[in-house]
Amino acid sequence: MKIGVLALQGAVAEHLRMLEEVGATAVPVKRVEELDDLDGLVIPGGESTTISKLMHKYGFMEAVQEFGKANKPIFGTCAGAILLAKRIQGQDDYHLGLMDIKVERNAFGRQKESFEVLMPVADVGADYPAVFIRAPYIMEVGENGQVLAKHEDKIVVARSGHYLAAAFHPELTEDTRLHKYFLDMVKEYRS
């Protein structure tokens, strides 16, 4: 399985390492044409407005939308989850609009309110270490979506078909289970 990590901003190297650890061939994606031979894509965290502007500037917005519409799995973490969402609280532009979720940006506070917590994630396991940095939360999941985890009664991991969104940064831990879950999704959609 060949999985790309959108390499415009964020913890790209960390995602690449995690994907390699779970058995994927992981590559940074810096040009639109590099999407062509991928089985799945990770959109890492960073600053969602900045990533969105870079995606527009370099032609990734439409290309990633087509990638998703071709039933290729996409995993968005933190800002990547915001970009995947169909709806963003108080904002209508600068996102992919692929996953049937509604998100609120910076829902757990600013940089200084960052924290780490152990939490259960359905289909992944207990005691998953979740690192929240200026994290969003998922306000709503569409009728075909699945809530995989909550923190303080707020949805922080959801799946809808071939899309996976996490409000936190799984790549900033040593726990590879969520990346393994995504790799299994990619295998499921490839077969």
Swiss-Prot record:
CDD domains: GATase1_PB. Coiled coil: none annotated. It comes from the Bacteria. The keyword Lyase applies. GO terms for cellular component: cytosol; glutaminase complex. It holds the Pfam family SNO. GO terms for biological process: glutamine catabolic process; pyridoxal phosphate biosynthetic process; pyridoxine metabolic process. The active site is at C78, H169, E171. It catalyses: aldehydo-D-ribose 5-phosphate + D-glyceraldehyde 3-phosphate + L-glutamine = pyridoxal 5'-phosphate + L-glutamate + phosphate + 3 H2O + H(+); L-glutamine + H2O = L-glutamate + NH4(+). NCBIfam families: PLP_synth_Pdx2. Catalyzes the hydrolysis of glutamine to glutamate and ammonia as part of the biosynthesis of pyridoxal 5'-phosphate. The resulting ammonia molecule is channeled to the active site of PdxS. HAMAP family: PdxT. In the presence of PdxS, forms a dodecamer of heterodimers. Only shows activity in the heterodimer. This is Pyridoxal 5'-phosphate synthase subunit PdxT. It comes from Brevibacillus brevis (strain 47 / JCM 6285 / NBRC 100599). The lineage of its organism: Bacteria, Bacillati, Bacillota, Bacilli, Bacillales. The gene is pdxT.
